[in-house]
């Protein structure tokens, strides 16, 4: 039997980063993962990481010469469905190899005193005499006692889905709750792709990769990989991309649904993809998850002081900080985007043209949005159906933001808050509800 203060299930970006923060708080931390160290997170290779995140999360900036580093770029374009209107956003981005970036994070965790065990799969929770979570058992038969168990296992959410507690939702992340990501690594015939360009209507993009004469053509879609391929076909038939030769494909998944209303209960916390913490406009998860982890480390350390047990009351501040901050903004954005995509290509072009929902960094918010939309309907440039969809989504978005900003400061008021939140999200719907051609 092993004894630790904290055991984390999952050694990818969320679990490894959080383990380092906890170890720096003088906690004894073990991270387990079902994969071998050599095969960890090798499903996807290239990823993009916003450069301001290095300083925000106190990570040493990757640079030329580092094994994980590929290149930098500093402009992201987005284009309308009919390819008529371009928006420009200035974002400094690093292109990197994900497995090697995680290796870099793991090195820092080891230096901080974290212990890793690979090729170990979660089997079940163990409980103390007061029926409180008190560690885990692995499928190899290993017993690990720990006062706090953290689920960082990704979409399978192997620990969270086994918990029966009023402060923890145990839903499974199903086909309607995630984006299936299809990535084509291509060799370009003539042109070069040095910046990222996305077409939000198709949930498609073309972006830099590790080969200078190559690119990544990608799409994300709910329901299935087969439907993602159908969306890729539609994307490539609708948008004139540079001529290319396909080198190989990668596939993966990212959560795309609202996160649990609570991330903690007695002796337990959920983070990363297991908590559905991704950016609503592009599905990226690394910085979104770390925003939750960063303040949580000190709260956990305080709860574990003097051999204490981390009750839901002691961990509750983790919920409050996140849900009133990034949680409120992402929830509102997610609800708004459901309405913004539920329209035709022509409607999407109109929104781009008038800087409604989609705008460049140097464009101001359209001060006459309602007037512009109504005029568009009258002139048959924008459909009445799209107006109703967008207006309804904006109203629902504002209600959800307001509700999250009123997140309860203690577990005592959670049940009432959750009940209203469930009603608001039922009215908002999901991105998968908008699919009509599956």
Regions found by a protein language model. Give the residues of each.
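N-terminal Rossmann-like FAD-binding beta1-loop-alpha1 element of flavoenzymes
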Residues: 2-31
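Predominantly flavin-linked oxidoreductase catalytic cores and closely associated redox partners
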Residues: 11, 111-242, 276
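Conserved Rossmann-like nucleotide-cofactor binding loop
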Residues: 14, 37, 156
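N-terminal FAD cofactor-binding segment of flavoenzymes
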Residues: 21, 34-76
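Glycine-rich phosphate/pyrophosphate-binding beta-alpha loops
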Residues: 43-46, 95, 203-205, 275-287
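Short beta-strand to alpha-helix junction loop
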Residues: 87-108, 158, 222-230
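FAD/FMN-dependent oxidoreductases across multiple families
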Residues: 122, 225-305, 312-328
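C-terminal helical "tail/cap" subdomain of flavin- and related membrane-associated enzymes
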Residues: 301-438
């Amino acid at each position: 039997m092993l004894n630790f203060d904290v055991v984390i299930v999952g050694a990818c970006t969320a679990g490894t980063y959080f383990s380092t923060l906890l170890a720096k708080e003088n906690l004894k931390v073990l991270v387990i993962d079902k994969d071998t160290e050599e095969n960890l997170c090798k499903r996807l290779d290239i990823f993009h990481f916003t450069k301001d995140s290095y300083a925000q999360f106190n990570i040493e900036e990757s640079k030329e010469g580092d094994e994980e580093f590929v290149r930098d770029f500093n402009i992201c374009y987005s284009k309308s469905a009919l390819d008529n209107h371009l928006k420009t956003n200035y974002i400094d981005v690093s292109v990197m190899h994900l497995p090697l970036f995680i290796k870099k994070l793991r090195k820092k965790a080891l230096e901080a005193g974290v212990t890793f065990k690979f090729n170990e799969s979660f089997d079940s929770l163990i409980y103390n005499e007061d029926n409180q979570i008190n560690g885990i058992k692995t499928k190899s038969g290993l017993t690990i006692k720990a006062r706090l168990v953290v689920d960082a296992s990704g979409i399978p959410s192997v620990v969270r889905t086994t918990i029966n507690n009023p402060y923890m939702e145990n839903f499974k992340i199903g086909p309607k709750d995630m984006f299936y990501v299809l990535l084509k690594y291509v060799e370009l015939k003539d042109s070069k792709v040095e910046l990222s360009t996305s077409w939000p209507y198709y949930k498609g993009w073309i972006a830099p990769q590790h080969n200078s004469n190559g690119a990544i053509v990608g799409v994300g879609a709910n329901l299935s990989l087969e439907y993602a391929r159908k969306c890729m076909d539609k994307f490539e038939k609708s948008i004139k991309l540079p001529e290319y030769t396909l080198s190989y494909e990668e596939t993966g998944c990212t959560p795309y649904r609202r996160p649990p209303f609570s991330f903690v209960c007695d002796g337990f916390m959920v983070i990363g993809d297991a908590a559905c913490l991704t950016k609503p406009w592009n599905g990226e998860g690394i910085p979104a998850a770390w925003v939750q982890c960063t303040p949580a480390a000190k709260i956990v350390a305080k709860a574990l002081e003097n051999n204490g047990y981390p009750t839901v009351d002691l961990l509750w501040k983790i919920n409050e900080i996140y849900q009133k901050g990034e949680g409120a903004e992402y929830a509102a954005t997610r609800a708004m985007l459901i309405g913004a995509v539920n329209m035709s290509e022509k409607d999407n072009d109109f929104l781009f043209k008038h800087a409604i929902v989609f705008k460049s960094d140097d464009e101001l918010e359209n001060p006459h949005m309602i007037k512009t939309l109504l005029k568009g309907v009258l002139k048959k440039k924008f459909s009445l159906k799209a107006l109703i969809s967008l207006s309804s989504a904006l109203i629902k978005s504002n209600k959800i933001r307001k509700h999250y900003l009123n997140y309860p400061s203690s577990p005592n008021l959670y049940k009432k808050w959750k009940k209203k939140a469930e009603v608001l999200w039922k009215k908002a719907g999901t991105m998968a509800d908008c699919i009509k051609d599956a």
